[in-house]
Amino acid sequence: LARCDFNPVEQAPAELKQGDFRDLAQVITALELGVCSAALKKALLEKAQTQKAPVLGVTGTGGSGKSSLTDELVRRFRLDQDERLKIAILAVDPSRRKTGGALLGDRIRMNAIHGDKVFMRSFATRASGAEIAACLPEAIAAARAAGFDLVIVETSGIGQGDAAIVPLVDVPMYVMTPEFGAASQLEKIDMLDFADFVA
């Protein structure tokens, strides 16, 4: 167990090469661990601003089918675009407050992510206190800077008053189940005011 406790990134890459999944993974890990240099962060943000890749945010209650929907969207994008579209998926799962652990299980539901044009990265919320990881804004910038055509961000399950994904994405999507309770409950769901799509 002691041997498992090590820093996977001793030093962040000095730059991010477009199309290099390993570089992107290392940069995101460095961002997550807080060991990314200020110069690289600045370069990522500047590069991301020159890219036109849209960012789709998929959010909703736990168990509503966010991962299954994300997988289906990726499958259809791949088929529709004849595998030309480069897609990055950034998926967030909740950390358990008592143990600090997280089951990064979004990928269990995803079958269409295997291919050389699809990058998938799991995150834990850690101590962010929200449905997103603290490093997510910078990770989105890194994915855009890496030259992807589409970035899909999936949050962990949310409650009625949560909408942290909205300022980070271009197109927010809310996924819900038909068992939401009385009709008056719909008036309490903050994401319904912001979502461009409801599934």
Residue ranges with predicted function:
Residues 17-20, 113, 165, 188:
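Generic alpha-helical segment signature
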Residues 31-53, 64, 69, 73-175:
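Nucleotide-state-sensitive switch-loop elements of NTP-binding domains
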Residues 13, 123-125, 199:
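Short hinge/gating elements
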Residues 155-159, 168-185, 192-199:
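Conserved Switch II/interswitch segment of TRAFAC-class P-loop GTPases
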Residues 1-55:
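Extreme N-terminal, non-catalytic leader segments
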Residues 59-62:
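Residues at the beta-strand->loop junction immediately N-terminal to the Walker
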